[in-house]
């Protein structure tokens, strides 16, 4: 979203567009995906495999470089992130208020990914993880009937699992919970199975066994699966407005 806004946004803001901040940032999430797919198609037409094209698409390389700069706290990139992140959470607050929802504690991945990286380093020291020639870090779970899982990219930037490791660790350290329940759709069943197993192999079975993934079936449109990056979604704010109107 940040890169697409920077390249195609023309300085558009929630105020100038009249859009909720989360909707505006979502718009550029879709815009990024549209340009990315166009570039992949062009590279495939030039003879690259689809896997190569996805890796070599210029806009994806730019996004990866922006992530690297963000993790390095580049002032320009970090400032843009703070601005757009603010737009998103202002939009979320409006939606949560309409639902009467509030939270005692919010954990942000931007505040836990470094802890996740520390856990990755711990795993390397313990021999639980291994480093490939491209410098990326993986865990081999094939003996457990699963797969190999990427934990850190070759350029040192984090992935979702890095962040989730850090977040889970911090939640239990701060709260000493009896159970931690993740309410997430069933498309993430494998992810949470891997998360629990990694934490167990790191030596945290005393609390990782108390992680529960409360899975639910995905809601689909008649046309198929909803995909936020393609803009094929039912907007929560519209749904709330419709329910209020119907009531």
Name each region found by the language model.
Residues 1-247:
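NTP-dependent nucleotidyl-transfer catalytic core
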């Amino acid at each position: 979203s940040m890169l697409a806004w920077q390249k195609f946004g023309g300085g558009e803001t929630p105020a100038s567009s009249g859009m909720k901040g989360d909707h505006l940032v979502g718009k550029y999430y879709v815009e990024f995906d549209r340009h990315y797919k166009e570039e992949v198609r062009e590279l495939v037409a030039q003879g690259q495999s689809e896997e190569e094209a996805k890796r070599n698409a210029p806009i994806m390389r730019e996004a990866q470089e922006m992530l690297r700069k963000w993790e390095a706290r580049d002032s320009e990139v970090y400032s843009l992130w703070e601005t757009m992140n603010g737009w998103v959470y202002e939009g979320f607050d409006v939606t949560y208020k309409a639902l009467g929802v509030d939270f005692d504690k919010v954990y942000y991945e931007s505040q836990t990914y470094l802890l996740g990286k520390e856990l990755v380093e711990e795993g390397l020291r313990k021999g639980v993880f291994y480093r490939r020639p491209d410098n990326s870090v993986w865990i081999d779970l094939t003996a457990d009937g699963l797969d190999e899982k990427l934990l850190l990219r070759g350029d040192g930037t984090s992935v979702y699992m890095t962040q989730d490791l850090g977040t889970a660790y911090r939640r239990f350290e701060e709260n000493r919970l009896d159970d931690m329940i993740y309410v997430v759709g069933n498309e993430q069943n494998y992810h949470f199975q891997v998360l629990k197993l990694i934490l167990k192999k790191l030596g945290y079975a005393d609390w990782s066994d108390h992680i529960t993934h409360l899975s639910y079936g995905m809601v689909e449109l008649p046309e198929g699966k909803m995909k936020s990056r393609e803009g094929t979604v039912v907007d929560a704010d519209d749904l709330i407005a419709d329910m209020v109107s119907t009531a």
